[in-house]
């Protein structure tokens, strides 16, 4: 038993429309887990080993089981505050973070560009130091990865990447949890990316091989992934004995793939490129024709919001589509990230197979 639990109330307490057993618990020394992430930043998954990423997924599954399935109330973040800086609007990132942090007993504080202008009204250095004195962690959704790097350098509290131009690590954690739930294991899966060489693809490239997953990615000419990311992904594939295929042919990328993945073709800040991008991405829509060359057990992922030109309704709303469980898992994975960076908690649930 990893924790000493003492039941304070035998009756269910009604909280937020759910019945929770209110328990008092203390975090003892982990008996099974050797991974310690407390105090770390989460800027990119390239900074984390396979075991560390697996630990965050394990913790995600644990919190989901204890809170959603068992109805427990776990105030692991009671008395803690989270600063949320959003230069880009969001549905899933904001809602999952705010509800998740509050569900764990903490207080999230949302700041938009009207409240805080990174590096404009106040330097990034000063902002980082002020936030460090008032919050326990910061989740920032920004245009430039370099801004996150500066915040992390100057802050004395964990900085979490809620999205940048280069990476979107918390989305990939949700994707992997969804796939683990569906396939029971990640090792040996082939991920087929069809779309832009963007922050989602970059985050997959920084992590898939660490799970023993293969990656086949198709992007239009001129929209390939970042060269430095590609170089590191090739190194990871070599170290882990996995396949990495980068092509401009969507059907080649989809061939034999277990998981078909795409994303928006036009990210926020690229609106002026819309006409050019729509032309460049002709032939990249995921359809049943794409699925015909995939593995017999194929599934589909999209981080949302989705446009019909990216994936047709037949695939998007099919029983093979995991997009809505994927969206829900944004909540459980960001909760796990915050718990792992801010507490000594270790999962009670048996470690899943990865």
From Swiss-Prot:
Outcome when changing residue 40 to C: In OTCD; late onset
SUPFAM superfamilies noted in UniProt: Aspartate/ornithine carbamoyltransferase (SSF53671)
Record flagged with keyword Repressor: no
Active site positions, chain numbering: 303
Reported impact of residue 247 to K: In OTCD; neonatal/late onset
Entry PTM: Acetylation at Lys-88 negatively regulates ornithine carbamoyltransferase activity in response to nutrient signals.
Phenotype when changing residue 181 to G: In OTCD; neonatal
Effect listed in the UniProt record for changing residue 39 to C: In OTCD; late onset
Outcome of substituting residue 244 to Q: In OTCD; late onset
Effect of residue 23 to G: Loss of cleavage of the transit peptide and loss of localization to mitochondrial matrix
Pathway listed: Nitrogen metabolism; urea cycle; L-citrulline from L-ornithine and carbamoyl phosphate: step 1/1
Residues reported to bind carbamoyl phosphate: 90-93, 141, 168, 171, 303-304, 330
Function: Catalyzes the second step of the urea cycle, the condensation of carbamoyl phosphate with L-ornithine to form L-citrulline. The urea cycle ensures the detoxification of ammonia by converting it to urea for excretion.
Protein name: Ornithine transcarbamylase, mitochondrial
Organism this protein belongs to: Homo sapiens (Human)
């Amino acid at each position: 038993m990893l924790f000493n639990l003492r039941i304070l109330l035998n009756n269910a307490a009604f909280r937020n429309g759910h019945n929770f057993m209110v328990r008092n618990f203390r975090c003892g020394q982990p008996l099974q887990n050797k991974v310690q992430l407390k105090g770390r930043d989460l800027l990119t998954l390239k900074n984390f080993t396979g075991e560390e990423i697996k630990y965050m997924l394990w913790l995600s599954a644990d919190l989901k089981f204890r809170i959603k399935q068992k109805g427990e109330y776990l105030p692991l973040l009671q008395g803690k505050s989270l600063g949320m800086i959003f230069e880009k609007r969001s549905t899933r990132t904001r809602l999952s973070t705010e509800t998740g942090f509050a569900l764990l007993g903490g207080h999230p504080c949302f700041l938009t560009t009207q409240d805080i202008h990174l590096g404009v009204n106040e330097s990034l250095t000063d902002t980082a130091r002020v936030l460090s004195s008032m919050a326990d962690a910061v989740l920032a959704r920004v245009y430039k990865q370099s801004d996150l790097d500066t915040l992390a350098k100057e802050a004395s509290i964990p900085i979490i990447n809620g999205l940048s131009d280069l990476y979107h690590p918390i989305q990939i954690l949700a994707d992997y949890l969804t796939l683990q739930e569906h396939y029971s294991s990640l090792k040996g899966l082939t991920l087929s990316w069809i779309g832009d060489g963007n922050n989602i693809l970059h985050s997959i490239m920084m992590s898939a091989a660490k799970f023993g997953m293969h990656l086949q990615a198709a992007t239009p000419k001129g929209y390939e992934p970042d060269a430095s990311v590609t170089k590191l992904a090739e190194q990871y594939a070599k170290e882990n004995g996995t396949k990495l295929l980068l092509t401009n042919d969507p059907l080649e990328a989809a061939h034999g793939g277990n998981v078909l993945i795409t994303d928006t073709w036009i990210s926020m800040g690229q609106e002026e490129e819309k006409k050019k991008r729509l032309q460049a991405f002709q032939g990249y829509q995921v359809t049943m024709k794409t699925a015909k060359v995939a593995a017999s057990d194929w599934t589909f992922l999209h981080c949302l919001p989705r446009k019909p030109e990216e994936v047709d309704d037949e695939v998007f709303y099919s029983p093979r589509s995991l997009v809505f469980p994927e969206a829900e898992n944004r909540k459980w994975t960001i909760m796990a990230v915050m718990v792992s960076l801010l507490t000594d908690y270790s999962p009670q649930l048996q470690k899943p197979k990865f």
